[in-house]
Structures are given as C-alpha cells and as structure tokens.
Design a protein with these regions (language model features):
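N-terminal intrinsically disordered/low-complexity leader segments
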Residues: 1-12, 201-203
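Amphipathic alpha-helical segments used for helix-helix packing
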Residues: 88, 102-126
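Amphipathic alpha-helical packing segments from all-alpha helical-bundle domains
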Residues: 90, 123-150, 161, 188
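Hydrophobic alpha-helical connector segments
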Residues: 76-107, 159-166
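Amphipathic C-terminal alpha-helical segment
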Residues: 98-102, 116, 146, 166-183, ...
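Hydrophobic alpha-helical segments that form the core
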Residues: 94, 107-116, 157-176, 188-196
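Generic hydrophobic, amphipathic alpha-helix propensity
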Residues: 13-22, 38-39, 63-67, 71, ...
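Helix-turn-helix
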Residues: 16, 24-58, 62
Length: 203
C-alpha cells in the first residue's frame, strides 16, 4: 500500500530566524531568553538550533550583527540621496519605520536595548555598537561636508555638530521606541527634527 506523501518541510530562512531571535532577545533580554523560547519562536528542534547556530551565545552574536546591518543599510541608502534634506528625512523617518515594524513584538532598537547589557556572549557589544555608530557618523558627516561644499548648506555650517544633532535625535527616537512610544508619536518627533535641521518645506 503506497504511503501518503508528506508535505515538504518548511524551508529554513536563516536571516528571518536571526531577526526573530533578535526580537526575542530584545523583548526578554539575553538572560531571560531560554533555549526553549528560541526553539519555539524559530520553529526548530534543540538539535537543529545548535546545529545551525552553535550555541545561544553564538546565536545572539549573529543576531546582533544581522540586525545591525539593517541600520547600516539605512544610513548608506540615506547618504546616497540627491539632497541633504532627503538624507536627514531618510535617516530619521526610515529608522522610525524600522523601530516600529508591524511584525516586531517590541518596538525599538536591539543595539540600544537592555539585551545588550546582560549578554554573556563573547561579543564585545559596547565596542561593536561604537564601531557601528562610528561608521554611520562618518558617512553622515562626509555627506554634510559635501552639502556645505556644494552650497546646499550655509558655508559656516558645522558638519560635525550637525551630524551630532541628527544622531542625538536618532538615539532619542530609539530610546522612546524602547519605552513603547507608538509610530505616530515618533514620526511627529522625527518630522519636527527634520524641520528644525532643514527648515520648513517650500510652499
């Protein structure tokens, strides 16, 4: 008697699994996230979880790096914009949309959450976060300097101070998102920040 055909197993999407793990660490913290929590969220057996990622600490490290790349991409795409007001808009507005993605269980940014503080992984999270922020600041400052050179910004504009202001608003949005602020409130703040930096839109 022929055996009934079984459905094909669900394909393993590593990037999706890493983002799901990141959101779980984000919501519960590193210490508060158990292996059972991870297997349930990712739909993997314990042996498959360890086979794919090695250990909880290694999964955390890879999840942090994968999540961080999303913000690196936001900045790199932003600075490629044709004008500086659009650069600022993309950095702030696109980040708010990322902080508050509908499929997240908790809003905000993993890299600035408590999950980083209680991690016992070998990843130096503080140094890694500093490196990422340093990269983002450098490319944003270079874009501001170009805007000054091309006459888009006033010749006496301070590119470093301007970059610091944008980054400060970004960090504030991230912190408020971690505290549960909703998307509409964060977008209002981001848009006000954009207006203060770039001026009101032309009528």
């Amino acid at each position: 008697m022929p055996q009934p055909k079984r459905g094909r197993p669900r394909a393993f999407d590593r990037d999706r699994a890493l983002l799901d793990a990141a959101r779980l660490f984000w919501r519960r913290g590193y210490s508060g996230t158990s292996t059972r929590d991870l297997t349930a969220r990712l739909g993997l057996s314990t042996s498959s979880l360890y086979g794919a990622f090695g250990s909880k600490a290694e999964l955390f490290e890879e999840a942090v790096r994968t999540y961080a790349e999303r913000y690196r991409e936001i900045y790199e795409q932003a600075v490629a914009a044709p004008d500086f007001p659009t650069v600022v808009e993309r950095v702030l507005i696109d980040s708010v949309h990322e902080f508050t993605r509908p499929d997240d269980e908790h809003p905000g940014c993993l890299l600035s959450s408590a999950a980083m503080a209680d991690s016992t992984s070998t990843l130096d999270t503080s140094a890694y976060f500093a490196e990422l922020q340093g990269h983002n600041e450098r490319i944003l400052r270079a874009r501001a300097e170009r805007a000054i050179e091309e006459g888009e910004l006033a010749p006496d504009a301070d590119a470093s101070a301007l970059t610091g202001l944008i980054q400060s608003i970004w960090h504030g949005l991230s912190a408020r998102a971690n505290l549960g602020a909703d998307r509409a409130d964060l977008l209002a703040v981001a848009r006000l920040g954009h207006t203060l930096i770039c001026g009101p839109p032309a009528p």
